Every structure is written in structure tokens, then in C-alpha cells.
Design a protein with these regions (language model features):
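A cross-kingdom feature that marks ATP-driven nucleic-acid transaction machinery
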Residues: 2-6, 13, 17-30, 35-42, ...
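Short glycine-rich substrate-engagement loop in P-loop NTPases that contacts/grips substrate
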Residues: 45-72
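Catalytic P-loop NTPase motifs of RecA-like helicase/translocase cores
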Residues: 53, 82-86, 112-113
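Conserved P-loop NTPase "ATPase switch" module shared by AAA+ and STAND
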Residues: 69-87
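Structural recognition of the conserved hydrophobic beta-strand(s) that form the central parallel beta-sheet
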Residues: 77-78, 102-109
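Conserved Walker B catalytic segment
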Residues: 82-104
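Short regulatory helix/loop adjacent to the ATP-binding pocket of P-loop NTPases
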Residues: 111-125
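Interdomain hinge/linker elements that couple catalytic modules in large macromolecular machines
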Residues: 129-272, 278, 282, 288-291, ...
């Protein structure tokens, strides 16, 4: 499968010393880069810092030894670079001309790289985001009719695997990804004291999918303090597991304020965390799964296309709601999601009274593709 970022990535290799590809665990970042190298006959060396033994040996090296190693090939691929102890010092020397090779970095968790360098990479277009293949990318690989028939599978198993992957293989792979997320060796600035609390946080959010929650509510359910929950959720967002939608409010009457909805950036991860791979006919959370999948796909579409946007939800104390609000340079638009296209959705009159200039659209199984790919 040719990923959406392929052409832009290949174009940067001859001119950039450092390229960073970030994205969720097991999303194919290293495989993508290795595929690019292979297809373009580029010599490279790969260091898999996600492997504990390799990480231990590499982190024993001095900076001088690390620089020597980097110069043994035209290109160096540092997988899960967040685990490299001397990462910032190494990159400083790369930029100072001490390394002839180009350095390709992958990261599933936030690496300890100075903000100025991260901003420079983003400005130069050298920081790519690579999630599991999006629905759009799958349709390019197969066809829209084929992928549309598999929507139910996407709601259950997410986008990590193609439609023809066996269900048991999907479940096993997703469970392993959850284990990898919970047991991740995060950087010192993103410490996790108790992995069981991290897993419990994920499970609570999974069980309240699509529901407004405050940090205090989550902390009360789990039995820990607010600061811990806020920090753990921040790490999960930075690690591409969650996306936080804050409530939209301009202090109008009856509006819900200071709460969040947490979106899982892959439905399969959400369902694996609570071990629920039941078919849709056996579920009570179909609309929540539909909403989560659509919002996650929309956010990923914008990110891989470098579209800057902000996202919100809206609720009132009188139970009126807009599931998703997108704000970009073209303006603001609201959306309500319903899996069953035969059931009409009413637009919330309170929202329309407060914000008559923000249109509200309905997205169902008959109208979703234009929403996912809207530019």
C-alpha cells in the first residue's frame, strides 16, 4: 500500500539530515521507511530501540561511538528514538556536520527533543504523522465499494489490519498493542508510575466513549488524584492513543463547560482495552463506535494532509448536543453522527439560536465518505 505521505517523504531524503515520523505503536512507521529505502535502492542501517537488549547496548555507547556508528552507512534508521539516552546530543552533532548520513527517526511516544528542533522539523515539512492506514488509503488500495462493505469491521477492529485479516489474528494483534502501550518505557519527562493505573484509565475512557467527562470524574472512578489522571491522559494523547475534544462554549446559557470527550484514534484499541469484539448486532454502543471512528478518521485525514484545525464538541444541560465541531481557516462546521441512515436527526435548536452562523450536518452510513475526505 502506498501511504499518503510517500511522495513528500521521498522528496525530502536527498536534502534533509533529520526526518521524524511519529505515530501510534505498531502503525507501520519503520516498515514504511524501510520500504522507501528498498524501493529507491538506498543503503541504510536500522537500530531497533524498541528491543530491550538492543536499547541497553546502544545506550552504553558514548556520543563519539554513536557518531562513528552513524557514519557507517548513508542512512540511519532509529526506530522508537524516544529510547535513545543521548538523542538530543546526537542530533545536535548531526546538525553540526559530524555525521554524513541522513537520520530517520520514528517515535510512538514523545521523544526528548528540544522544542526548537521539533518546530524546525515541522516548519520544513520533515515531521510526518503516520497512523494505521486511513479509510481513504484502504479505498485506494482496494476500492470504495469493498471498504464500504467492511465498515462494520472497522468499527470493531479499527484500521490496523486489512479486511481480509482473520478475526483471531486481529484480536491477538490489538491485544498485543494494548500491552505495548501500557508497558511502554516512556521518557523521563513522561513517567508512568503504575501501569495498572494507566490501563484502568484507558478502560474507563473506553467504557465512557462519547460521553463528556471531567478529570475529577475519571479520578474518582479510578481512585487516584486529579493530577495523576491529567498527566496520564496527556501522555496517552501525546502517544497517539487518544484525542481530547474540549467542550465548545462562549458562556451562553445552559452550555456545558470545562468537560471533555476522549476519542480513541483507533476503534480496535478501544475495543481491545475492554475485551469487547462482539459483532454490531450484539452491541449497545454502535452509535458511540460510529462517532469515534468518524472523528478519529477525520482528525487523521487532516493531520496527514497538513490541515491545521481545532476540534470541539457541544452539549447543553438540556441534553441537546453537537457531536463534533471542526474549526479551520474556512470557518466552523458542526456534525451529528448516526449509524442508521433511516433515523433522522434533529438539529439542536439551542445551538442554532446561539450560533446561527455555524452549520450543522448529519453524517450517517450514506454520507460519511464526503465527510472523511472534505478539504
Amino acid at each position: 500500500m502506498e501511504r499518503r505521505i510517500y511522495s513528500a517523504f521521498v522528496a525530502l531524503i536527498p536534502t534533509h539530515k533529520i526526518i521524524l515520523v511519529s505515530g501510534p505503536k505498531n502503525s507501520g512507521k519503520s516498515a514504511f521507511i524501510e520500504g522507501v529505502f528498498s524501493e529507491n535502492n538506498l543503503a541504510y542501517q536500522k537500530i531497533e530501540l524498541g528491543e530491550a537488549l538492543i536499547r541497553q547496548e546502544i545506550n552504553k555507547l558514548s556520543l563519539a561511538e554513536l557518531l562513528w556508528l552513524a557514519n557507517q552507512s548513508d542512512h540511519m534508521l532509529l526506530c522508537e528514538c524516544e529510547h535513545l539516552a543521548l538523542l538530543q546530543e546526537f542530533l545536535d552533532e548531526v546538525l553540526n556536520g559530524k555525521v554524513n548520513a541522513s537520520i530517520m527517526l520514528t517515535a510512538a511516544n514523545p521523544p526528548d527533543i528540544e522544542e526548537e528542533l521539533l518546530e524546525a522539523l515541522a516548519y520544513q515539512g520533515a515531521h510526518f504523522y503516520l497512523p494505521p492506514p486511513t479509510f481513504y488509503e484502504y479505498t485506494n488500495e482496494t476500492s470504495l465499494p469493498i471498504e464500504s462493505k467492511g465498515i462494520d469491521q472497522r468499527l470493531i477492529y479499527g484500521n490496523y489490519y486489512s479486511l481480509n485479516t482473520q478475526k483471531l489474528d486481529k484480536q491477538e494483534g490489538l491485544n498485543q498493542t494494548i500491552n505495548n502501550i501500557v508497558s511502554a518505557n516512556f521518557s523521563a519527562s513522561n513517567r508512568i508510575n503504575k501501569s495498572e493505573v494507566l490501563l484502568r484509565t484507558i478502560q474507563v475512557l473506553a467504557n465512557h466513549i462519547g460521553q463528556p467527562l471531567s478529570y475529577n470524574q475519571i479520578a474518582t472512578i479510578i481512585g487516584v488524584d486529579n493530577e495523576t489522571i491529567e498527566r496520564y491522559i496527556s501522555i496517552l494523547c501525546k502517544s497517539h492513543v487518544l484525542y481530547r475534544l474540549p467542550s465548545y462554549s462562549t458562556d451562553k446559557k445552559y452550555e456545558l463547560k470545562k468537560t471533555n470527550i476522549f476519542i480513541f484514534l483507533d476503534n480496535g484499541i478501544r475495543n481491545a482495552s475492554i475485551n469487547n469484539f462482539n459483532d454490531l448486532l450484539m452491541r449497545m454502543d454502535i452509535d458511540a463506535l460510529w462517532m469515534n471512528w468518524l472523528i478519529a478518521e477525520r482528525i487523521k485525514w487532516n493531520k496527514i494532509n497538513n490541515v491545521m484545525a481545532e476540534y470541539f464538541f457541544w452539549r447543553s444541560h438540556t441534553r441537546q448536543q453537537v457531536d463534533f465541531i471542526e474549526c479551520n481557516v474556512k470557518g466552523m462546521e458542526g456534525y451529528k453522527f448516526k449509524y442508521n441512515k433511516k433515523k433522522p436527526l434533529k438539529k439542536p435548536p439551542l445551538f442554532q439560536n446561539h450560533y446561527p452562523d455555524i452549520p450543522v450536518h448529519t453524517v450517517n452510513t450514506g454520507t460519511y465518505f464526503s465527510f472523511l475526505t472534505k478539504k
